[in-house]
Regions:
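Hydrophobic core
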Residues: 8-14
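N- and C-terminal low-complexity/disordered segments
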Residues: 3, 16-125
Length: 125
């Protein structure tokens, strides 16, 4: 059921802007929230370069945005893993999110984590 809803949302975005009119970007701007400390930050994340936020490791796999002549939208494919508090690199990394996030509709596909919140703001132009 969830896949059907996401598919419908993607088709709405694609019908409004042709699939080939999306522009790729090497960087995304994410808003991060630590729910325990209530600290909010806007962070740039580069393509294929893991970014550490608390116990989360965020990796941007793809970022795209629409050109100025169509309704504004940004979409990013993110992989987010919870690495815990282990110091060694061989610690178990649990994937907590792997999918597309949309700047205009953050509730459609979002990270569900008890401590952290991550939202896509935009892709760098």
């Amino acid at each position: 059921m969830f896949g059907l809803v996401v598919g419908m949302v993607i088709s709405i975005f694609v019908s409004g802007a042709q699939a080939n009119s999306w522009l790729s970007s090497e960087q995304a701007f994410l808003q991060t929230l630590d729910k325990i400390t209530a600290r909010i930050a806007t962070v740039p994340v580069k393509l294929n370069q893991p970014f550490q936020f608390g116990t989360l490791e965020i990796e941007l796999k793809h970022c795209a945005f629409t050109p100025p002549e169509v309704p504004p939208e940004a979409a990013a494919f993110l992989e987010i893993r919870d690495v815990g508090f282990a110091d060694n690199e061989e610690a178990d990394k649990i994937t907590v999110f792997s999918g597309w996030m949309f700047a205009s509709s953050p509730a459609v596909s979002s990270l569900e984590h008890p401590v952290y919140d991550v939202t896509l703001l935009a892709c760098a132009k």
